[in-house]
Structures are given as C-alpha cells and as structure tokens.
Regions:
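A short, N-terminal "cap"/entry segment at the start of jelly-roll beta-barrel domains
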Residues: 1-32, 141-155
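Conserved short histidine dyad/triad with adjacent acidic residue
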Residues: 19, 35-51
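Short, conserved beta-strand element in jelly-roll/cupin
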Residues: 37-38, 50-69
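Ligand-binding loop in jelly-roll beta-barrel domains
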Residues: 86-114
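Short, cysteine/histidine-rich loop/knuckle motifs that typically chelate Zn2+
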Residues: 121-124, 145-146
Length: 155
C-alpha cells in the first residue's frame, strides 16, 4: 500500500500551473496518474495530441475544462468525466476566469508514440512537434518538426 498527499509533490514543468505526477510516487506500474491545477488559459497538454497505446480519462474536480476533440469542442464541468481512446486526438484548455482542478488517468502507463500538433507561426499551420529540455533542464520547449521553430516554452 502507498499513501501520499498531493501537496507533498514537486510541481512538474509544463502547460499547467500545477502538475503533479502521482503515479510515480505511488509506484503504479500499469497506469499513469496526474493531478493538474490550471490557471485561466492553461492546458493539461503541450498541444493537440494522441497517444498510440494509452487511453486517457479526465475527472474534473473543480471548475470547467474545454476539450478540443476530433468531433468538436466538449466542455466538462466539476464531477464529470471524459475518456479518450488510444489514437484519439484531444487538447484541454481552461477557458474560464477561475482555476480548474482535474485528475488525469492514463492506461497503460507506457503511452507509446506521441503524436503532437501545435500552430507553427513560421509554417502558418498546425504541424508535428517535438518536446525537448533546454536551459540545463529548467524549461521544456515545443519545436516544429518541419522548420525547427520554437512554438512554446514551459518552465
């Protein structure tokens, strides 16, 4: 048995104001478990994405979270859950004025290949992206695979 308090975790850099990797602390082997707290404009993901092998479930604890999906926008409010199958593209965003707290669950823990798309200002369209650590590991950037332009920076 493992028992932990969410506030005992270090924050993980990324597109969310608060991201805590609960699965690692609990020693989960077959699923990923993350806690997010999103400021207005924040997301749980670096861009519109799909995991090759992993299904994802998001449980909104507080607030309202809007997902861009292949079927259009879907808004999930407190005490609602949304599921995405492996290979299904999505991106969340806090479009409100308040903070959103959400629990993300992914299984299996090994998500496989990540397909990640973001708007590239140099290419003028949404393109494939890579994520890399920069500044001696103090930040993550998303970079366009086609032209190499930096499309996002997260500390």
């Amino acid at each position: 048995m493992e028992h932990v308090a969410i506030d005992d975790f270090d924050n993980w850099m990324g597109p969310a104001d608060v991201k805590r990797l609960l699965g690692k602390a609990l020693g989960t082997e077959h699923m990923g478990l993350r806690f997010y707290e999103l400021a207005p404009g924040d997301s749980t993901a670096f861009g519109y994405h799909a995991h090759e092998n992993q299904e994802e479930v998001f449980y909104v604890l507080d607030g309202e979270l809007t997902f861009e999906t292949e079927a259009g926008e879907v808004t999930v409010v407190a005490d609602e859950i949304i599921r995405f199958a492996p290979g299904e593209f999505q991106r969340s965003r806090n479009e409100g004025d308040g903070r959103v707290r959400v629990l993300g669950i992914g299984a299996p823990a090994d998500a496989g290949e990540l397909a990640l798309l973001r708007e590239c200002p140099d290419c003028g369209e949404r393109t494939d992206q890579e994520i890399e650590a920069v500044d001696d590991g103090d930040a993550l950037v998303t970079r366009c695979v086609d032209c190499g332009a930096e499309t996002g920076r997260f500390a």
